[in-house]
Amino acid sequence: MRLILLGAPGAGKGTQAGFIKDKFNIPQISTGDMLRAAVKAGTPLGIAAKKIMDEGGLVSDDIIIGLVKDRLKEADCAKGYLFDGFPRTIPQADAMKEAGVAIDYVLEIDVPDEAIVERMSGRRVHPASGRTYHVKFNPPKVAGKDDLTGEELIQRDDDKEETVKKRLSVYHEQTEVLVGYYNQWAASGQPGAPKYRKIAGVGPVDQIRDSAFAALAG
């Protein structure tokens, strides 16, 4: 099972990716995770990427493709893989094609912008553990405090409302074109063309998971 998850930032791709990778026993290749690890380690790549992400921009194709190519060489990708947050642009999608990266399915998770702004701007994180809360959907027992340690929660820079809206604008301008790109490729009947599936990403998490599994079964 080799697939790409498409959808706006905050559409729930990461959550559904977790369910899919467990069901099919494949690694989730998240450029966000790879970038955050680089930021945390303070590598030159990480420092450059943090500045771009904090401003709501997209990290350059060269940086991302370099990370992805290295990742696909690892042994756990032999049976398949799940891309979450990649490709984000037509040049990245073309680079994947040229590199011979096989894709069986492209799954789009569709969520309205207003729902995404509410989801993301309400996130709060405990920096030391990575535990995540939401002021409305999953609040801590004490407002602004981690349940286990009582330490302060923070709002990540890329979860602030202004940044979320900018990221959505960037998504609509640069990444949404991939919906058409993969739809056309899927409809072309060309050898190696993936199947394209679209599901609604609003509602109970389990319901969205079941929709995703059903989409990947046909």
Swiss-Prot record:
EC main group: transferase
GO biological process terms, semicolon-separated: AMP salvage
Pathway: Purine metabolism; AMP biosynthesis via salvage pathway; AMP from ADP: step 1/1
Superkingdom, natural source: Bacteria
The keyword tRNA processing belongs to this UniProt entry's keyword annotation: no
Reactions this protein catalyses: AMP + ATP = 2 ADP
Paired cysteines (S-S): none
Family annotation (InterPro entries): Adenyl_kin_sub (IPR006259), Adenylat/UMP-CMP_kin (IPR000850), Adenylat_kinase_CS (IPR033690), Adenylate_kinase_lid-dom (IPR007862), P-loop_NTPase (IPR027417)
Primary site of residence: cytoplasm
GO (cellular component) term, any one: cytoplasm
Compartment list: Cytoplasm
The protein's role, per its UniProt record: Catalyzes the reversible transfer of the terminal phosphate group between ATP and AMP. Plays an important role in cellular energy homeostasis and in adenine nucleotide metabolism.
Quaternary structure and partners: Monomer.
Family: Belongs to the adenylate kinase family.
PANTHER family hit by this protein: NUCLEOTIDE KINASE
Entry protein name: Adenylate kinase
Organism encoding this protein: Janthinobacterium sp. (strain Marseille) (Minibacterium massiliensis)
Gene designation: adk
